[in-house]
């Protein structure tokens, strides 16, 4: 099958701003059944975690604007189509930016620490559990590293012995003894099979993840937390009357430090996994129709999928804005989780679908983001 040529991407900064119109238009063709489901509702209730400065909320504003521009929402409908119920961000300066949002896409509630959703006894248990598994990994890695060092020393020693043996071969050939010398024993093999750090991180990390997930489910998550916008205790999940006749979607971007090339590479053994489990368990109890999770490409989405398999269909893709014609080389893994008992999102989520319907040629460079005159840019 011959692959169709990608459509031309944005040609200017203004076209980048409105490129979501193209994406929404394509989606309404490929995902018509999904849009038909949405039209039966009053709209979307959105919550975000690891919220940063509100990128998901801003993206929602662009999507709704595109729907209005394309005639699928009236101006009145667009004003209330998305209700941003809650954001959650640990960093105070980011919360200040979130609090400055005052349009229709400003979160009604702004919360802080995701760990506030776990009872104190669960946090204590998880902390002890992760220390146990981290210590086990540390010992295993020290043993493996020591074995490798021993093997290298042994190989070096054998190599040195071999060189000396060659140097003395002539003398040994001439030497005659009355009795044969006893044969030396063969040198021992490796002290243990070679194990990489990545192998040990994966083995111990997945063991700790499964044990921690079982532990976190022993207690219900806390349903309220301090709200920095209201200065009081507010509901973490949107209440049933707010969700009525709406589709509930959560968009979050987990901490990338354990998974990125420049991060710790501790995977599930990193302490922030406890935070991730607090986030995930609170969502499982609320059961949004869709969870969209963003992280770096090395994120272990298959283990993540195993945690959610009882409730969600989970799929994952890696791509960057460059594939949509936007000159931002920021490859990320996007994992989408659709609730099994609703399955309201019928659009096929595959690399082929994305390529056929959303990929566009990259026709501009990052210079498009500069505001300097073109005459100056030519000199750069």
Which residues does each PLM region occupy?
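Conserved phosphate-binding loops in nucleotide/dinucleotide-binding enzymes
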Residues: 114
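Active-site loop signature of alpha/beta-hydrolase-fold enzymes
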Residues: 56, 93, 117, 257-259
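Class I S-adenosyl-L-methionine
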Residues: 120-165, 173-248, 253-380
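Conserved residues in the N-terminal Rossmann fold of short-chain dehydrogenase/reductase
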Residues: 111
């Amino acid at each position: 099958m011959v692959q169709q040529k990608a459509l031309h991407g944005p040609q200017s900064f203004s076209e980048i701003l409105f490129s979501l119109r193209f994406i929404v238009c394509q989606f309404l063709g490929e995902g018509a059944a999904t849009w038909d489901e949405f039209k039966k509702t009053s709209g979307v209730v959105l919550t975000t975690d690891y919220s940063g400065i509100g990128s998901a909320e801003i993206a929602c504003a662009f999507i709704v604007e595109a729907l209005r521009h394309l005639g699928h929402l009236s101006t009145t409908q667009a004003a209330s189509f998305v209700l941003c119920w809650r954001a959650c961000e640990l960093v105070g300066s980011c919360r200040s930016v979130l609090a400055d949002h005052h349009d229709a896409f400003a979160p009604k509630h702004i919360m802080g620490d995701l760990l506030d959703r776990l009872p104190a006894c669960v946090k204590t248990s998880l902390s002890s559990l992760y220390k146990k598994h981290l210590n086990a990994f540390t010992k295993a890695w020290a043993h493996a590293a020591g074995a490798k060092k021993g093997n290298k020393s042994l190989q070096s020693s054998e190599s040195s012995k071999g060189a000396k043996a060659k140097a003395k071969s002539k003398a040994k050939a001439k030497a005659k003894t009355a009795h044969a010398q006893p044969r030396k024993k063969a040198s021992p093999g490796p002290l243990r099979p070679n194990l990489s750090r990545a192998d040990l991180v994966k083995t111990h990390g997945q063991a700790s993840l499964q044990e921690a997930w079982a532990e976190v489910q022993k207690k219900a998550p806390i349903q309220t937390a301090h709200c920095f916008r209201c200065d009081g205790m507010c509901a973490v999940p949107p209440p049933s009357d707010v969700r009525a006749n709406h589709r509930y979607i959560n968009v979050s971007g987990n901490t990338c430090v354990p998974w990125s090339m420049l991060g710790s590479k501790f995977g599930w053994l990193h302490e922030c996994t406890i935070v991730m489990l607090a986030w995930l368990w609170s969502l499982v109890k609320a059961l949004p129709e869709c969870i969209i999770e963003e992280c770096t490409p090395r994120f272990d989405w298959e283990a993540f999928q195993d945690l959610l398999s009882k409730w969600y269909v989970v799929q994952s893709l890696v791509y960057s804005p460059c594939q949509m014609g936007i000159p931002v080389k920021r490859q990320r893994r996007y994992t989408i989780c659709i609730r099994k008992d609703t399955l309201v999102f019928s659009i096929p989520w595959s690399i082929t679908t994305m390529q056929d319907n959303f990929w566009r040629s990259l026709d501009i460079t990052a210079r498009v983001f500069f505001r300097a005159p073109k005459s100056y840019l030519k000199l750069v």
